[in-house]
Amino acid sequence: MNTPVRLTQYSHGAGCGCKISPKVLEIILAGSGAQNLDPRLWVGNASRDDAAVYALDDQRGVVSTTDFFMPIVDDPFDFGRIAATNAISDIYAMGGDPLLAIAILGWPVNVLPPEVAREVVRGGRAACDEAGIALAGGHSIDAPEPIFGLAVTGVVDKARLKRNDTATAGCRLYLTKPLGIGILTTAEKKSRLRPEDVNLARDWMCTLNKPGSRFGALAGVKAMTDVTGFGLLGHLVEMADGSGVSARIEYAKVPRLPGVEHYLAEGCVPGGTGRNFDSYGARIAPLPQDRVDLLCDPQTSGGLLVAVEPAGEAEFLAAAGELGLRLEPIGELVAQRPYAVEVL
């Protein structure tokens, strides 16, 4: 325990970049049987939304989600915080409020000391404390690589429920966190992270997406999702295709972490970037590789992608400002075209 443990050296993937690619996932789900068409299931997996929502009564529903992954940072406490923050995000992305969480822990008990796992759980509990919810239990297994995450339960009023497939043409698109998480964490894993960039990605990954709960109350917010492992373009393709519209993105207006261009030039591109483009590229208008590398970068605990109709834009920006967010539109939704997404 005298030498600091580098958790990223014990995993083949990192964070949401560990996700099975959408193309492979499609094969898995296609042969797994049809979803039970329960009318009380307001949101299931048909639209690949962030969480499932089941009616408690005519006005309120329970929101259920789970998310877990392998280490994306070396520090155990930070890994726990990030994994928990990322899992809780799905509740906020539906416009809901989290109620409680249970932990999911896989640990190579013959390789890493239990004291390190304890720090991971402690970090997860810290994120739950910040969200105002209890880490009420969990389940653990002996696994070949470290894994941590949460299953989270929340609640949402039906009138506040936000989906990823209800956007309309004319909506402006907003992103609440900068891109580049996968790029900087890949640089960290390769020991190429510059001193001035240490903890930059970590701080964003540990930032809760609480604004999503506030945005749920806004009628002008027509659709919302969080940007995670499939990258901005992957999640935007799902929003556009699910809503029957197309999207135009202005590349220069997409927020990004400082230093991403430097690290891309250094070859710090996570493997998930290529898998994302391989899965969604046919739905995206042709674009240069450097734009693919940023816009398909898998995010862990990424920001909210919000579609706002023009009539509700002023109210949305006012609410965002009250929450400390200074947002500018990164694009808009238009009538459906051959491509789901075009980058200008």
From Swiss-Prot:
What does the record note about the cofactor? Binds 1 Mg(2+) ion per monomer.
One Pfam family it belongs to: AIRS_C
Enzyme class, UniProt record, top EC level: transferase
Q: Which domain of life is it from?
A: Bacteria
InterPro entries cross-referenced by the UniProt entry:
PurM-like_C_dom, PurM-like_C_sf, PurM-like_N, PurM-like_N_sf, SelD_I, SPS/SelD
The record's catalysed reaction(s) read: hydrogenselenide + ATP + H2O = selenophosphate + AMP + phosphate + 2 H(+)
GO CC terms of this entry = cytoplasm
Q: Where is this site: Important for catalytic activity?
A: K19
Keywords carried by this UniProt record: ATP-binding, Kinase, Magnesium, Metal-binding, Nucleotide-binding, Selenium, Transferase
Which residues are listed for Mg(2+) binding in this entry?
D50, D90, D226
Which parts of the sequence bind ATP? K19, S47, R48, D49, D67, D90, G138, H139, S140
Q: What is its EC number?
A: 2.7.9.3
Q: Which Gene3D superfamilies match?
A: PurM-like C-terminal domain, PurM-like, N-terminal domain
Catalytic residues (positions): C16
Q: How does it assemble?
A: Homodimer.
The similarity comment for this entry is:
Belongs to the selenophosphate synthase 1 family. Class I subfamily.
PANTHER family (alphabetical) = INACTIVE SELENIDE, WATER DIKINASE-LIKE PROTEIN-RELATED, SELENIDE, WATER DIKINASE
Q: What does this protein do?
A: Synthesizes selenophosphate from selenide and ATP.
Name the UniProt record assigns to this protein: Selenide, water dikinase
